[in-house]
From Swiss-Prot:
Record-given protein name: Nucleoside triphosphate pyrophosphatase
Keyword Cytoplasm: yes
Lineage: Bacteria, Pseudomonadati, Pseudomonadota, Alphaproteobacteria, Candidatus Pelagibacterales
GO cellular component: cytoplasm
Named cofactor requirement(s): a divalent metal cation
One GO biological process term: nucleotide metabolic process
Broad EC category: hydrolase
Amino acid sequence: MVKEIILASKSGVRKKILEENNIQFRVEPSNVDEDSVKESLLKEKVTPTIISKNLAELKANKISQKFTEEIVLGADSVIDLEGKIISKPNDREEALEILKRMNGKTHQLISSVCISRGGSMIWNYTDKASLTMKNMTFLELENYLKKISDKDLYAYNVYQIEGEGRNLFSKIEGDEDTIMGLPVKKIKEYLKIIK
């Protein structure tokens, strides 16, 4: 089993998941320009799943080229609402608009992970969760946004599923770690067998 991995992300949520699962790691952010990569892939009309996979691989490979002997973990999550990707909000006004678009609808949250060594992918995994948002009033949506911090708002794709965000949904199907952006059970399985 690998003693330590490199997390190619500065995501506080992903760091927390790894810590809670006793996975030894250090952080080397990839600083990939996700928006331009997404924009380019959307022009090619690829699916949200492919976008998530490609971004996770790009992040892992970029850092893996720098630290060739080490195991590097890249991850990415994408929200697919009716075939359209929902990006993280830049401010509370955008967050409210996103929540209004999701209101009463089901969306898919796609989380991909990639493990690379020597600049190339050696393993990847993608998982999906399906979340159905309650029909909520404008006031309820505004009140929800008032309850969460700016940090949580931007880090969790508008909703913090392990906190206040759970109250937004009438139905949640899928693994909570996937919804939080890191399907850690599969990562742990793979790390047990890798040399």
